[in-house]
Amino acid sequence: RSNVLTSQWLNSAVTYAYYPGSTFKIITASSALEEKLVSTSSSFYCPGYRQVRDWKINCWKRGGHGSETLVDAIKNSCNPAFMEIGAKLGISTFYKYFRAFGLNEKTGVDLPGEVSGSFWDVNKMSEVDLAVASFGQNFEITPLQLITAVSAVANGGSLVTPHLVERVVDSDGKVILDNTQESHVAMKDMTA
C-alpha cells in the first residue's frame, strides 16, 4: 500500500523509463540523414522481416511493405527498413547520436526525481541489439527524454534543456533564478 501511495506522487514523465518503440524511428532516421547514409528517396525492401545473425526479426506487417522510400518507411513504421538504416549507421555512430540527442543522461529539467534511461554498454552491443534499438526496443528512456530529443528535429537541430520556469524575479526586480536557454547542436539545421 505504501508503494501505491508513493507512486501516485511521482511524475511519470521523468521518473519512469520505457521502450520508446516506433517513436524512436525519427532519431534513427535523423542520424542517418545527418551522416548522409540515406536520403528521403533512399529505397528499401520489406519482406515482413529482416534476418540479423540467427534472428528473424519481424515487421509489424507480417506480409511486408515491399519496396519503399525512406519517407514511406517512416509513414509505414517499417521495422526492417529501420534495421537496415541502423546497420548502415553501425554501433559506434548509432551511439554517437544517442548521446548527441541527450538520451544517455538526464535532461536537466527542474523537476525532482528525474532518472536517466538505460542503454547497452557500447562495447557489448551486438548486431541484434543494434537492429532492435533502431526501431526503439531493448533500451529505456523517459517520456521527457524522448520529447526533448524529438524536439531537436523541430528546433533546427538544437537540443534544448527543458525548464518549467524561465525566470524568477523578486519584488525589487532582482533576478533570483534565470534558466537561460541552454542548448547544444544535435544535428545540422538542414538535416532537421
Predicted feature residues:
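Beta-lactam-recognizing serine transpeptidase/beta-lactamase-like catalytic domain environment
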Residues: 1-22, 27-192
